[in-house]
Amino acid sequence: MVELGQINRPEAESFSGKRKLYCVASIFSVADAPADYTALVDRYWDEVSRQLEKLESAGKIKKVFSEIIMEQGDESLDILGKINERVPQLIKKKLEEGGVLVPLESADFLGPYTDWSNCLRVVYTREVFQKVFGFYNEVAEKRLGHILDVIEKNLSEAEAGLLILKDEDRVKLQFPKDIEVFLITPPSYDDIMRWLRERMMKKNEKD
């Protein structure tokens, strides 16, 4: 697994002929988010775009995989845009440069996964939480298995792909050994994580 700093031409040549997957953490803001957090998220996606351009010296992106996307076309991108408006912009740019959008999700798993995830947010009793978490965990594992299968079957030899997925999901994926994984972690990523930790600490202090 490669942490992106800066890959120069000799290093890029060492990845020639290998399957490559450029992984970007899906980070988004919400309508009522504080201005400083929204600014951090915007800076994050700007930096991601610049780092991807540098990284593509190791291989131009030919396949694009993104969470939420269940089918090709503008409709799926519009749905994704309601959650994270910066991701469709990045995807469209890569499609214009010759990439192909590959549906990553299955309605059989994404729907139940979302429902059980929402249920976990409103459960109060330990007994019910354990039951709901069991259902959630079961469908979450099936969803991740499907995601891994889609990438394995659609990323061809010597191709480079872009994966946009929450970090907590990505770390659970066991990619085949012949896929070289690159993690895109611009400076603003750490700033966002720090912002979220401080926010949580302040909330806990109030509680």
Residue map of PLM features:
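Compositional signal for N-terminal targeting/processing segments
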Residues: 1-207
